[in-house]
């Protein structure tokens, strides 16, 4: 049986995108990677919200963790007898944080958890609030390591895998979700080849994922997003492994734009499709993917690469950031609570209630 203790974390888990210093939040600026390693320092909640919206920090779990620390920063100048009274003053800041990225359910989940903490806290509410943010981060790291072992256990030795976007340490408290499974699979000699799609338009695969794997000494092969179907046809890939920003009650999964087409291609070519995400990403109140708000970003993000314009003036662009993969195209959903094979409303309820 695979366990998280089988993995050499000194080798496979040393990148940290979020650092709480005690009076400020340091965020590794993921817009500048891989060529510039630089941190943005946030001193208040509005700076955290701006960093989330600007993709300084990204990845659903990391967004939730950053938002939790944003609440701690917002509380610094608030004077209140207990947490419930403090919450009344903090609510505008929480709403601004919540509006920074609407699709990722982890953001709303983390803020709801901070609200519950405040409502239950007495005069020591500031200390309780900081401890809650720290707990969210620590629990995410532990969950990622456990998911890594669970997901790796599904993969046969010698397999090739394809991943999309960035789901590693940069997107979480550490180790990663889908990339955590890949790290665990490499450590246990189950995965022989790793392929990563470039992930237009922000190139999270090209800029972040292959860089992360390089830091761990894992060889990865970058492909154009449009090459994925042909890669599967060659037989080089046995699993597509992705993360999630929201998982619905029927297994429908919102993730980075381009995920849906990978799932369609995988099913056509007999390639297995795995979604890896913490249970905080599961939204049992959302019945199916049709109810998910899909974030639309500035069309200008499609007009160039690396600051160089590649498109003629006067061209329209459509730039949804996420798409929804139907649950029937997913072979396994892996959370820290366990593995759901071939997700349906029934086995999702059995795993998560609702």
UniProtKB/Swiss-Prot annotation:
Q: What is annotated as the active site? A: 245
| UniProt keyword annotation of Cell cycle present | no
Enzyme Commission identifier(s): 5.3.1.23
Q: Where does substrate bind?
A: 58-60, 101, 204, 255-256
* Residues that span the membrane, as ranges: none
Catalysed reaction(s) here are: 5-(methylsulfanyl)-alpha-D-ribose 1-phosphate = 5-(methylsulfanyl)-D-ribulose 1-phosphate
What InterPro entries does its record include?
IF-2B-related, IF-M1Pi, IF_2B-like_C, Initiation_fac_2B_a/b/d, M1Pi_N, NagB/RpiA_transferase-like
Question: Pfam families this protein is in?
Answer: IF-2B
Asked if Isomerase is a keyword of the record, the answer is: yes
* Pathway per the UniProt entry: Amino-acid biosynthesis; L-methionine biosynthesis via salvage pathway; L-methionine from S-methyl-5-thio-alpha-D-ribose 1-phosphate: step 1/6
Question: For site (Transition state stabilizer), what residue positions does UniProt give?
Answer: 165
Keywords, ordered alphabetically = Amino-acid biosynthesis, Isomerase, Methionine biosynthesis
GO MF annotation terms: S-methyl-5-thioribose-1-phosphate isomerase activity
A GO BP entry: L-methionine salvage from methylthioadenosine
Its function, per the record, reads: Catalyzes the interconversion of methylthioribose-1-phosphate (MTR-1-P) into methylthioribulose-1-phosphate (MTRu-1-P).
Q: Which PANTHER family match?
A: METHYLTHIORIBOSE-1-PHOSPHATE ISOMERASE
UniProt similarity note: Belongs to the eIF-2B alpha/beta/delta subunits family. MtnA subfamily.
Query: HAMAP family from the xrefs?
Result: Salvage_MtnA (MF_01678)
Q: By its UniProt entry, which NCBIfam families does this protein fall under?
A: eIF-2B_rel (TIGR00524), PRK05720.1 (NF004326), salvage_mtnA (TIGR00512)
Protein name as it appears in the record: Methylthioribose-1-phosphate isomerase
Q: Which species is the source of this protein?
A: Stenotrophomonas maltophilia (strain K279a)
